[in-house]
């Protein structure tokens, strides 16, 4: 914890110096109830319950805030909240898209992403499984489910489509998503 404090002090001092340079003063410390509300919304997307607020207000230990952080990180709602942005980036949808927008159950992939966040899966493993889980030696069911990242694109099920044209569209969509997710840039202009 001493290292955490030194790290925090380093950042606090940097921020304070910049505020002084701009002739600004830091915001006052929020009250405990506000801190818990902010923390809960940030980590789970949900406001704290009255019981959680009462427990936090009664906890006068020096690490009361840290205990709340740990509690919220253990909540299944943490994975749900953290998965939202990734699922958006991965184009997650329980439908095929286009005009004939039929149901496509992608819930196993969604549940896998939520579980990966809740288990604190290392980022390299999280990415590796999604891109090539099926190509790893002795892939598990979880690894295979993770590769649904590569199948989240729209699929046209309309009659009379030109199959080859849409195969190309699917590849372009996956390539664009890869660029957005892993390169931090759009590659759509290369189409």
Per-region residue spans from a language model:
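Short, structured secondary-structure elements
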Residues: 1-191
């Amino acid at each position: 914890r001493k290292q955490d404090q030194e790290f925090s002090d380093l950042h606090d001092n940097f921020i304070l110096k910049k505020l002084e340079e701009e002739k600004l003063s830091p915001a006052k410390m929020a009250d405990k109830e506000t801190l818990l509300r902010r923390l809960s919304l940030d980590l789970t997307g949900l406001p704290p319950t009255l019981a959680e607020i009462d427990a936090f207000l009664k906890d006068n230990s020096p690490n009361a805030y840290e205990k709340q952080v740990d509690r919220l990180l253990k909540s299944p709602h943490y994975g749900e909240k953290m998965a939202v942005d990734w699922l958006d980036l991965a184009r997650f949808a329980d439908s095929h898209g286009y005009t004939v927008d039929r149901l496509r159950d992608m819930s196993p992939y969604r549940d896998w992403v939520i579980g990966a966040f809740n288990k604190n899966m290392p980022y390299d493993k999280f990415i590796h499984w999604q891109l090539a889980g099926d190509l790893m030696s002795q892939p598990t069911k979880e690894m295979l489910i993770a590769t649904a990242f590569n199948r989240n694109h729209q699929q046209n099920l309309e009659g009379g489509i030109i199959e080859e044209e849409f195969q190309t569209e699917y590849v372009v969509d996956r390539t664009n998503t890869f660029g957005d997710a892993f390169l931090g840039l759009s590659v759509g202009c290369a189409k």
